[in-house]
């Protein structure tokens, strides 16, 4: 049980990196990017291609791929996403769904259907682990991924809180019209958000390829996991995204103790439970009653009946 909790905690770091970009893009541009998981796979295959064809270390390849992913995000926002911002919710969904299909088939044409991994390029690190008291085995790569997740989210928090660009992003996310009246350049903000979001997707894809295998059509599964982590943790909070990723990872690890197929099922059940609770609270709020029938609710009903 303890080992499963630790493994779930570390898995949450990967989910946090994966979900942060999805949450940022939705928070700033109100776009649910259905190609987010496929962009993560693009980043993974980019790192794999550099390591296989040029003999680069995975870490150096990752450092080269991340700026390219950021440029891809800027290009997508400028030539694709920007044209759908004022078209309602359906068109962005259709456009990003189509983008995901294009990316999947492009990767299939370039790399085939065979699953790939960065394990061999990492050498001993791919299998290295620490033994904790009680005989608990913890892999070094999951720990590194979790540390990277905390560092990345901390850096993003500093960016959003202490820089002019960050304040512009937060203003555009909270009230786009008021931000525009205050002189915030929406196009600049959207491009920055898209660059960060797609780079984070690429980072998550590379982290996955270091610990497991990736294949061209694996994007939709990653999208579901990212979406669940965002909903569980709450949209608009970076540390909430980390919490959502950790809760999702712990649920999956505990589910795997019950049965192998329980890994994904437990995560889905947690997502549905949290989503149902949020919808119930929203419904109670819309009715003008407290979400929980505590003493304030009882007192309010007594006053109303009097």
Locations of the language-model features?
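Membrane-interfacial amphipathic/re-entrant helices at transmembrane-helix boundaries
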Residues: 1-17, 46, 56-61, 87-93, ...
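Single transmembrane alpha-helix segments in multi-pass membrane proteins
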Residues: 2-52, 76-91, 230-238
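Helix-loop-helix "hairpin" substructures at the membrane interface of multi-pass membrane proteins
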Residues: 11, 133-214, 238-244
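Transmembrane alpha-helical segments in multi-pass inner-membrane proteins
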Residues: 15, 55-66, 191, 195-201, ...
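Mid-bilayer segments of alpha-helical transmembrane spans in multi-pass integral membrane proteins
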Residues: 70-71, 75, 96-114, 134, ...
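Cytosolic-side transmembrane-helix boundaries in multi-pass membrane proteins
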Residues: 110, 174-188, 258-306
């Amino acid at each position: 049980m303890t080992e499963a909790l630790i493994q779930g905690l570390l898995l949450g770091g990967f989910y946090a990196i994966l979900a942060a970009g999805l949450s940022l893009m939705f928070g700033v541009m109100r776009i649910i990017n259905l190609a987010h998981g496929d962009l993560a796979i693009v980043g993974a295959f980019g790192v794999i291609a550099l390591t296989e064809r040029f003999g680069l270390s995975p870490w150096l390849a990752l450092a080269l791929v991340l700026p390219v992913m950021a440029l891809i995000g800027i290009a997508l926002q400028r030539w694709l996403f920007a044209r759908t911002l004022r078209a309602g919710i359906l068109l962005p969904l259709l456009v990003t769904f189509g983008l995901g299909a294009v990316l999947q088939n492009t990767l299939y044409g370039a790399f085939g259907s065979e699953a790939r991994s960065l394990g061999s390029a990492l050498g001993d690190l791919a299998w290295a682990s620490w033994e904790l008291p009680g005989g608990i085995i913890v892999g070094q790569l999951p720990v590194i991924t979790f540390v990277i997740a905390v560092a990345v989210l901390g850096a993003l928090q500093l960016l959003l809180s202490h820089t002019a660009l960050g304040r512009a992003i937060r203003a555009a996310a909270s009230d786009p019209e008021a931000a525009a009246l205050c002189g915030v350049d929406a196009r600049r903000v959207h491009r920055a958000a898209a660059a960060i979001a797609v780079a984070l997707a690429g980072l998550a894809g590379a982290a996955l390829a270091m610990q497991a295998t990736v294949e061209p059509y694996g994007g939709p599964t990653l999208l579901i996991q990212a979406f669940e982590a965002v909903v569980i943790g709450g949209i608009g909070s970076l540390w909430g995204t980390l919490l959502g990723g950790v809760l999702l990872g712990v649920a999956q690890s505990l589910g795997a103790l019950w049965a192998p197929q329980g890994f994904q099922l437990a995560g889905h059940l947690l997502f549905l439970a949290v989503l149902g609770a949020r919808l119930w609270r929203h419904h109670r709020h819309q009715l003008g009653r407290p979400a929980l029938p505590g003493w304030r609710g009882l007192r309010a009903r007594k006053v109303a009946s009097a």
